[in-house]
Design a protein with these regions (language model features):
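Core catalytic region of metal-dependent phosphoesterases/phosphodiesterases
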Residues: 9-21, 26, 31-144
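Short, intrinsically disordered, charge-balanced linker/junction segments flanking boundaries
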Residues: 145-150
Length: 150
């Protein structure tokens, strides 16, 4: 349920039994940056999958600072495979393919200021596209979360 920037996720456990559930929270992955530690990221996701954990991606999954209209643009920090004219399209496609096997564990992907900057300057919502792709491809029910600051 989305109310403004607040995302509520309700879990209905009908059995009435005590249930232990692992939760995995990650933020600021900056997946398309050369500084993203992908080995650690995927190792953590493998552990989450093994434990049947709910995964919450809390903002800035994408670095997304190398677009044409971003004043912070520095191509040297963009992973080489994304240095192409369809950068935003390709990074969504590539990352979604790499996340497919974890889709049923991912409960929510929320945008951060990096995704919102791309939405403002390039009129595309990277995190929403990622969620849509994963849900359509895998049948998962990932929620696209909100963004807010207090």
């Amino acid at each position: 349920m989305q109310t403004g920037a607040v995302t509520s996720i309700l879990f209905d456990f009908e059995s009435g039994e005590l249930l232990e559930k692992w939760l995995y929270f990650t933020s600021d992955t900056h997946f398309d940056s050369v500084y993203c530690n992908r080995n650690m990221f995927f190792s953590d996701l493998d552990q989450a999958k093994l434990r049947d954990a709910f995964v919450f991606v809390i903002g800035d999954f994408f670095d997304a600072m190398q677009g044409r209209f971003d004043p912070r643009r520095d191509m040297s920090i963009l992973r080489p495979e994304y240095r192409r004219s369809d950068y935003y399209d390709y990074v969504v496609k590539d990352s979604s393919e790499k996340l497919e096997k974890y889709a049923n564990n991912i409960a929510m992907i929320a945008p951060g200021n990096h995704e919102l900057s791309v939405l403002k300057n390039a009129n595309t919502f990277l995190s929403d596209r990622l969620v849509s792709y994963l849900n359509n491809k895998t049948g998962s029910r990932i929620i696209h979360g909100g963004y807010g600051g207090w």
